[in-house]
Amino acid sequence: AKETAHQIGTPLTSMVGWITLLKEKHKKSIPLIEIEKDIARLNLITDRFSKVGSIPKLIPSDLTSVIKETVSYLQKRSSEHIKFKIQLPNKKIIIPLNPQLISWTLENLIKNGIDAMKGKGSLNLRLLEKASEIEILISDTGSGMKKEVANKIFKPGFTTKSRGWGLGLSLAKRIIVDFHKGKISVLKTVLGKGTSFQVLLKKAPFKNSKE
């Protein structure tokens, strides 16, 4: 994984240089701005791969901002027939987390919902602050899944013919449960109606949160 990250990193560095040159000639080009965001995201991915095996650092971060940035990025790259409904508190929610890993987890859950809706439907995300934890609910109006499938989707390599989760959700579980000491689950799923995922994160710092 680390070697792959190194190989990807070299052309990415070159792409950053070319984008910088193009921006000097087209300073207000929206496509260039979005391409730059894509490259930045690829850089984050290669950075994660280069640190495989290491324990990620958790720092006090604003979860609200992480969610806004993640949703904004995905919304611009989704079908216009996917309606996003985002409910967030009008304040910062500061908790110990790794912003990049939480963003990746949310992106994975949202993408699964978008895939399940096949280009048309509603994607709802709600952030709720409770006494000792933060709850994130992500719901879609997609195809839903059978109970036996819902019980297996967090296992490494599990997939179906219609939805290819691969390692995505198993890594999401590791990020939430092992690294952030939280919980992730399928809260509800109904065939033909949709699925709701629940993520719970601790509000207070826990042991080794700065390691």
Region roles according to the model:
Residues 30-81:
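Conserved DHp (HisKA) dimerization/phosphotransfer helix of two-component histidine kinases, i.e.
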Residues 54-57, 94-97, 160:
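Conserved micro-motifs of the catalytic ATP-binding
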Residues 176-177:
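Detector for a conserved hydrophobic position within an alpha-helical segment of the HATPase_c
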